[in-house]
Swiss-Prot record:
Role, per record: Regulatory subunit of the Rab3 GTPase-activating (Rab3GAP) complex composed of RAB3GAP1 and RAB3GAP2, which has GTPase-activating protein (GAP) activity towards various Rab3 subfamily members (RAB3A, RAB3B, RAB3C and RAB3D), RAB5A and RAB43, and guanine nucleotide exchange factor (GEF) activity towards RAB18. As part of the Rab3GAP complex, acts as a GAP for Rab3 proteins by converting active RAB3-GTP to the inactive form RAB3-GDP. Rab3 proteins are involved in regulated exocytosis of neurotransmitters and hormones.
Homology family: Belongs to the Rab3-GAP regulatory subunit family.
Bias kind Basic and acidic residues: ranges: 959-973
Keywords: Cytoplasm, Endoplasmic reticulum, GTPase activation, Phosphoprotein
Protein known as: Rab3 GTPase-activating protein non-catalytic subunit
Taxonomic classification: Eukaryota, Metazoa, Chordata, Craniata, Vertebrata
Keyword Endoplasmic reticulum: yes
């Protein structure tokens, strides 16, 4: 086992984060402007508001530079990843993006971790400050149930202004100004249990490096402060008070002296010198007269890298018994000289918003730093240090410099012990590996504590170096070890080594369960992935003389041999044997054997010989030195190989059954009579026709053939028992086909195969599972070859006779687990044809075995014995037989239903939308049993939606029931459903299949139940895409075809509350706001659909409300229906059906629904005719407005009594507009047939009748509306329709006066606007009174001026009939008659 680099996480959309941090790169990438919406659907739009702040782009001087910057942008960012891999920070200049962990299902069904942006924006609060460093520190939970686990992650960010700010999920917790210089580096140390008793226990701390100072914050104090701040932020957000003072913070501040520049640092922690080192150090500092203390003092050690010296070592003396001071002892500690403890000042508060507000405050007072001189260093005037990385055990440190060197330091001695060359701009990190005691191999003569599996675990450290110039990642064994791994990873990656784990643990909580934390990882922006480096412990032990290293070399050589393109067949096996025998370590030898067995390039004979050779070699060794695990591994693989060889030989034998097969034989075999067999054949034939699909088969995809490599992966030998590993359904089918496919086709001996598999150790239950998986998955081939039923019967009989298949002591009154296993497989299968056949075979074999057992028991009975034993046997037979009969009925029902759902109406009635083209899921008995009482009707409703069949077709297919119940669906003002002959022209076998389904499911597919489910399915699909208005129209059609008013009321109420009322209220408020029919853009924004779809939606709402009113009227006349279920489906469980929910609904409050119907009619009319200056809610008083959009079953305070005349006037004007618009629309349709075809909204609606009905409810005079309608008809020249409409007018005298004016307008147009000679002569002969009256008329009010004179004469005579003789205008009417008659003679 060698080093490996494994991807453990990926980015959801790293390119978007790059565009946010580097706006100048946004337009350079074509995909940046038009990103795939599927990739960005999970990102929060509000979090990316800062993207709009585009920066001016400067043209690139070179194309290569631009291309390189696209990939190397991560090198310019500040990057930090939490050790628990739950949060990542990417920052640049003033911007930062916080990425959170998400889990996503991959195509293989496994969960994969991804990073997605949870927050982004600007993190700078001071003008001109930039981000310089960042850390993600997970904080331990304080709850008992999650001790040792992370509770939340704090983000620490350092700035050029000197501020250090602490965040959580985009919210600023606190900000601290500890020094006025820029923050160079942030580093953290968390608690680790000491490995040895003599090792000093290190405290947690956060260290902040400035150009001339180091500030260390005690970890315990920081942990408590952060927890308090987080709690206070939550309280402030809840109460709205942001002026909560955060708790103080204790810290130390050291001023570093005698060094030119500092770039990076490492805080080693508290150390104690040995007595010799103590005296040596005291002599060097104070000379030979220096006083020596009895106990060595404790010191905090710091190492810096930079220049002059290249590496500096600092030691801060501490009191060995002096604890860290808290803020309570602040006054006492202010004058201490050893270290400066003070309460952190300068709190800026925090913000609950994503973007911080600018707060103008004075900078806090800076505490002076305690001077700390460098004790010694590594002087090198030309060398400048760039970074330092401390090892996990605090004994070694790696330093990089500007010469391209990586130098390994001994921290305790302060010397360089190793140097690597050629690593310019290197990034470094450490990996610490603990030895696994189970992998330790004892060697002879080794008596050390590490030589046995009971000794302590050893720890190895490896240095990881990433060289971006070369794009290589190397792993080195320390201190003087070789390179143990190298990987080509690209030139634009970032190596992340946090060097800490979870903050807030102690020696107790750290011993509890902890989540896995990574030690080092590589972020690759090109592949948008995060990779971890895995190093096995034994690589630390490898050297040139190591046996393990030799074994690894042989394993690599073996892998290369297996990968060879054209291995020599004559020597291939010999070379493999030689390599296997040369490997010494059992674990490595097992790994080598596994690689050989997993290779698909090694022949079966070679695998068998190599495994046998390894087995023989182990047996020839001394018993004490033989590894039992390896011996068992070889033995188990040999048994599997022998089984594979035996099955392959049986499958290749030329075996053909010569027994003829007839229909009579099949009937006898399945225990069916001729009628039942014919019915079964007919059902399977219809099923096969409707389920025929064009499939592609390749020659190499031969059934019954399984590579030995795959065979070994599927099976396992453990404790002398052969078991099948947990595999997928496809893998079970492949293994079962290898065992049984030839037998099912009669091409292999069934008896020999069963004997071979039983001898190998496979249990009958496993064999039955494999047999059924093959049979049920190969449905198409089985239905094409009925002879396979006989082979299945034989195979099942042989399996059932195995020893442990059916327990002989099983209680005769219980169900056999053997047959229950087979029934469960049939119940769960979605291939209903194969499942039905297998159930018939199982029923036949079970009955045959029960009969033979009964005969055997009967033959052993003595003559004087009681017949009780025979009775018990028949009870057992009856119990199991009933289960088989129930399953056969259920499978038959499921088969008929599946046949129906796969049938198609040809050609389709209308253009199918995308939801109608989606395939329906296949059915199984299990799905129907778990689907609830409405599962069957729901499945058929989904199919009806796919085919878009009309409700009339469902009624015709159920014509026999219609004869018994001749009630027709009620018709209202809604559009009548089309005739079947107009829509369904060629439906093929659909009506017959529907009729068969009705017969099979008389209760589940009762017509009202089916219409209810269809209604609900259509409205659900409409809700997904409101632009498909025809879905909602079709839903209302199904609703109106429901005969039972209780069901109809419940369904309509559920539809209204679930899908319609929100959109209806939004449309109401929108139209009331704009005062007219809204435009398309406004409709889409507020209601979620176009203006055209909105018009149809309002019409459907009106139909639904009218249907509810009609259903409420007839509720008391009809009883509540009783929902029955077929006997075979009484055990169904699952969700409550739609019809049951509908019957649970309360009755509606009739006046409230009528009130909503009035509003809906107003909205529908305004949208249909695009009326202007219409505010729907202005037509109602305050009571009417308050009652809208309330629960339709509740009792609301509605308008009553006399209405304000102002409201009545406004309502009358609206209704007159509707009538005028309706007549105008009808007139335009009569003149332009194309307009009639284009207009589909309200084309069959009698708008005048609707207006009159609205006038009745709105307290407007109905006769005014009728008279206006008559006048509009005559104005458009529709005199014949006008004569019919006159009959409905009550006040004929007022109508006659209005028509008299219209007649005058017609004559005025004919006389004054034609200007003919005859007309002028006629005008001169008219009476002066009539001339004056005609001149006062305005012919422009006429909508149609081309009316014949004869029609006008008829209108004048009609006016004379309507006017009484005493009327003031009667004489004027007489003069008009004379004038019209005179004009007729011209």
């Amino acid at each position: 086992m060698a080093c490996s680099i494994v991807q453990f996480c990926s980015f959801q959309d790293l390119q978007s984060a790059r565009d946010f941090l580097f706006p100048q790169l946004r337009e350079e990438t074509p995909g940046a402007l038009r990103r795939d919406p599927s990739k960005t659907s999970n990102w929060e739009d509000d979090s990316w508001g800062a993207w709009e702040e585009t920066e001016p782009q400067e043209p690139e001087e070179e194309g290569n530079t631009s291309k390189t910057q696209k990939h190397s942008w991560l090198q310019e960012c500040v990057l930090s990843l939490s050790p628990t891999s739950d949060l990542m920070v990417i920052a640049r200049e003033q911007k930062a993006a916080f990425l959170v962990r998400k889990w996503k299902h991959s195509d293989k069904g496994k969960e994969e971790m991804q990073f997605a942006v949870g927050w982004s924006g600007s993190v700078s609060a001071e003008e001109g400050e930039y981000v310089t460093s960042a850390l993600c520190i997970p904080l331990a939970s304080q709850k008992r149930s999650s001790t040792g686990r992370p509770d939340w992650t704090c983000i620490v960010v350092g700035f050029t202004s000197g501020y250090v700010r602490f965040y959580t999920e985009g919210v600023l917790l606190l900000a601290q100004l500890l020094n006025e210089d820029r923050v160079l580096q942030l580093k953290c140390r968390t608690y680790e249990i000491p490995r040895h008793p003599g090792v000093t226990e290190q405290n947690e701390e956060l260290s902040i490096l400035y150009p001339a100072a180091i500030v260390t914050i005690d970890g315990f104090s920081l942990f408590q402060s952060l927890r308090a701040c987080r709690n206070q932020v939550a309280k402030a957000a809840a109460s709205g008070n942001e002026n909560i003072q955060p708790p103080p913070l204790a810290y130390k501040k050291w001023g570093l002296q005698d060094i030119d520049t500092i770039i990076d640092h490492a805080s080693i922690g508290i150390m104690t010198l040995s007595p010799f080192d103590q005296m040596k150090t005291a002599s060097n500092i104070g000379g030979f007269n220096a006083a020596i203390k009895n106990s060595p003092p404790a010191m905090s050690q710091y190492i810096t890298v930079g220049s002059s010296p290249f590496t500096g070592f600092f030691y801060a003396l501490e009191g060995s018994t002096q604890p860290l001071l808290s803020h309570v002892a602040l006054a006492v500690a202010s004058k201490l000289t050893s270290a400066l403890f003070s309460a952190a000042s300068g709190w800026l508060g925090w913000k609950s918003k994503h973007e911080e507000e600018t707060v103008q405050k004075q900078k806090p007072k800076m505490e002076p730093a305690t001077p700390l001189a460098v004790r010694f260093g590594l002087p090198d005037s030309r060398r400048h240090g760039e970074s330092i990385c401390l090892s996990p055990c605090n004994t070694l440190a790696a330093v990089t410099d500007d010469f391209g060197r990586v130098i390994l330091l001994d921290v305790a001695r302060g010397i360089a012990i190793r140097m690597w060359k050629g690593y310019r701009d290197a990034q470094i990190g450490w990996i610490q590996i603990v030895e696994d005691l189970h992998e330790r191999v004892p060697e002879k003569g080794d008596f050390s504590p590490f030589g046995n599996t009971q000794g302590p675990s050893r720890v190895a450290q490896f240095l990881v170096i990433y060289a971006p110039r070369r794009g290589i990642l190397e792993v080195w064994s320390t201190q003087q070890g070789p390179r143990v791994g190298a990987f080509n990873v690209g030139k634009h990656c970032r190596l992340l080594y946090p060097g800490y784990k979870i903050m807030g643990l102690n020696n107790v909580t750290s011993q509890s369960w902890q989540p896995q934390t990574y030690q080092i990882c590589l972020v690759d922006p090109v592949s948008a992935s995060v990779k971890a480096v895995n190093v096995p412990f034994h690589l630390a032990l490898s050297d040139k003389k190591s046996e393990r290293a030799k074994d690894l070399h042989l394993v690599k050589k073996l892998a290369a041999l297996l990968r060879a393109k054209s291995p020599r067949p004559d020597s291939f096996e010999a070379e493999i044997k030689e390599l296997i025998l040369d490997i010494k370590y059992p674990a490595t030898k097992k790994q080598a054997l596994e690689s050989i067995l997993a290779s698909d390039r090694v022949s079966f004979s070679c695998l068998r010989n190599v495994t046998q050779t390894s087995m023989d070699t182990l047996k020839n060794q001394e018993l004490e030195s033989v590894d039992e695990g390896l011996l068992q591994f070889c033995a188990s693989k040999l048994k599997l190989l022998h089984l594979y060889e035996s099955v392959s030989q049986l499958n290749t034998l030329d075996f053909h059954s010569d027994t003829p097969f007839s229909d009579n034989d099949l009937a006898v075999l399945l225990r069916l009579d001729d009628k039942e067999l014919l019915k079964l054949r007919a059902l399977l034939e219809k099923y096969k026709q409707e389920n025929t699909k064009a499939t592609v088969r390749f020659s190499e995809d031969a059934d019954g053939v399984l590579p030995v490599k795959t065979f070994l992966e599927y099976l396992d030998y453990e404790k002398d028992a052969l078991s099948i590993r947990k595999t997928s359904e496809e893998e079970c089918v492949a293994l079962g086909s290898f065992f049984f496919w030839k037998c099912l086709h009669g091409e292999s001996s069934t008896e020999d195969m069963c004997h071979t598999l039983e001898s190998a150790g496979l249990s009958p239950q496993q064999l039955l599972s494999l047999l059924l998986s093959v049979w049920l998955s190969k449905e198409k081939d089985i239905l094409d070859k009925p002879q396979s039923v006989c082979c299945l019967h034989t195979m099942l009989s042989l399996l059932s006779k195995m020893k442990v298949a059916i327990d002989e002591t099983w209680d005769s009154q219980s169900v056999s687990p053997w047959w229950q296993q087979m029934r469960m497989a049939c119940i769960q299968s979605e291939n209903n044809g194969a499942a039905l056949l297998s159930a018939h075979v199982g029923h036949s074999v079970a009955a045959q075995m029960s009969s033979s057992a009964t005969d055997k028991k009967f033959s052993q009975m003595v003559l004087d014995a009681d017949a009780e034993a025979l009775t018990d046997s028949w009870e057992a037979l009856s119990l199991d037989t009933e289960y088989w009969k129930l399953l056969l009925r259920q499978l038959e029902d499921c088969l008929i239903l599946q046949t129906l759902l796969h049938s198609r109406a040809s050609p389709p009635a209308a253009k199918a939308s995308s939801p109608q083209t989606e395939p329906l899921p296949r059915l199984s008995v299990k799905k129907l049993l778990e689907g609830g009482k409405g599962g069957i009707a729901d499945s058929v409703a989904k199919w009806i939606f796919k085919q878009d069949l009309s409700p009339e077709l469902l009624k015709c297919a159920n014509r026999e029931k219609d004869v018994e119940n001749p009630d027709e669906p009620r018709e209202g003002i809604a559009r009548s459903p089309p005739e079947v002959s107009e829509v369904e022209t060629d439906l093929g076998a659909v009506p017959d299949l529907l009729r068969l389904a009705y017969e099979q499911f008389p209760c589940s597919l009762e017509l009202d139940v089916l219409h209810a489910h269809c209604c609900w399915e259509y409205v659900v699909q409409w809700n997904k895409d409101p632009e498909e208005a025809r879905f909602l129209v079709r839903s209302i059609e199904h609703l109106r075809h429901i005969l039972n008013p209780h069901v109809q009321n419940g369904i309509s109420l559920m539809m209204w509350n679930t899908f319609l009322v929100k959109r209806f209220s939004a449309a109401t408020y929108l139209m009331d706001k704009v005062g007219k029919s809204p435009k398309d853009r406004l409709c889409r924004r507020d209601v979620g659909m176009s203006d055209t779809a909105l018009t149809s939606f309002l019409g459907s709402c009106l139909d639904l409300l009218q249907t509810s009113l009609e259903a409420d009227i007839s509720r008391d006349e009809v009883q509540v229906p009783v929902l029955d279920t077929e006997d075979a489906w009484l055990s169904v469980e699952g969700p409550t059906s739609i019809v049951e929910l509908a019957l649970e609904q309360k009755p509606i409050h009739y006046p409230l629904v009528e009130h909503h119907s009035i509003l809906c009619s107003i909205l529908y009319a305004a949208m249909s005719f695009s009326l202007k200056s219409v505010k729907p809610l202005a037509l109602f008083d305050s009571k009417g407005k308050n009652a809208f959009f309330k629960d339709l079953t509740s009792i609301q305070l509605l308008p009553s009594g006399e209405m304000d005349p102002n409201f009545i006037s406004v309502r009358q004007q609206f209704l007159l507009k509707v009538v005028s618009a309706a007549v105008q629309a009808q007139h335009s349709k009569d003149k332009d047939p194309s307009a009639r075809a284009a207009d589909t909204h309200g084309q069959d609606l009698n708008w005048t009748a609707l207006a009159v009905d609205l006038a009745h409810h709105l307290q407007v005079s109905e006769d005014v509306i009728r008279r206006h309608y008559v006048g509009e008809l005559y104005s458009y020249g529709a005199d014949l329709l006008g004569e019919e409409a006159i009959l409905q007018v009550q006040d004929k005298e007022v109508l006659a006066s209005q028509l008299l004016v219209l007649t005058g307008q017609r004559l005025a147009h004919a006389l004054f606007h034609t200007q003919t000679k005859e007309g002028m002569e006629l005008l001169a002969r008219l009476p002066p009174t009539l001339c004056t009256w005609l001149k006062a008329m305005n012919p422009q009010d006429l909508q149609n001026t081309g009316v014949p004179v004869a029609a006008t004469a008829k209108l004048v005579h009609k006016v004379m009939e309507l006017l009484p003789e005493k009327h003031g205008q009667y004489s004027l009417a007489l003069h008009l008659i004379e004038a019209v008659e005179a004009m007729a003679t011209l």
